[in-house]
Amino acid sequence: MKSEGQVRIPSGCAIAAVISKEGNKMSGEMITNAMKPMHDRSNGLGGGFAGYGIYPDYKDLYALHMFFDERATRKNCEAFLKERFEIVKSEIIPTRKIPSVTDEPIIWRYFVSPLKSVLAALQLDEKEFMVRTVTKINTEMKGAYVFSSGKNMGAFKAVGFPEDVGRFYRLDEYEGYCWTAHGRYPTNTPGWWGGAHPFALLDLSLIHIS
């Protein structure tokens, strides 16, 4: 048996996931509550969730979840999006005030469909076009960040403990057939809203503990 100091376990995060193989919908309150017993495996520098099947009314559209530092940035980004997409719906993502979740950016979502004329001109399929668009915004548009971009799914994340982040985003009002959750415990990096897990691109979302 190894003694104290001979074992190093670098992972310190909290994770949870639930999926219905039958495709039955589950409230986001379930996954939020699942994170509560793991409170001490996070340190409040990042919590997040991803839900699948949560946008049945817009299931054929890409749901862009975005952070903006200021209104002018959002307007500039929206003008950019209108050049590339049909924007079917644009709205602020509903939240509730939570004392432990502070300094929130502007949190917005767009339900969009790539313009066929743009796809034809660029000779790209939808997925490659989406990846390039998300990458361009996140690397070139200061103050704008796409943190979720799939169909009929969405990531929700913030600086805070995951159970508080779930309440902040009102996940109890969503229903999905699959949920993942993560609580960060960074020891050498700062917490920022875009850096919380899950990391999402198209329909994929990633959480990890190391």
Task: Tell me the role of every PLM-derived stretch.
Residues 54-177, 181:
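Extended, highly charged
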Residues 188-203:
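A short acidic-Thr-Gly-centered motif at the start of a beta-strand
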Residues 13, 47-48, 177-179, 204-205:
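Structural motif
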Residues 1-61, 120-155:
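Extreme N-terminus nucleophile/cap motif
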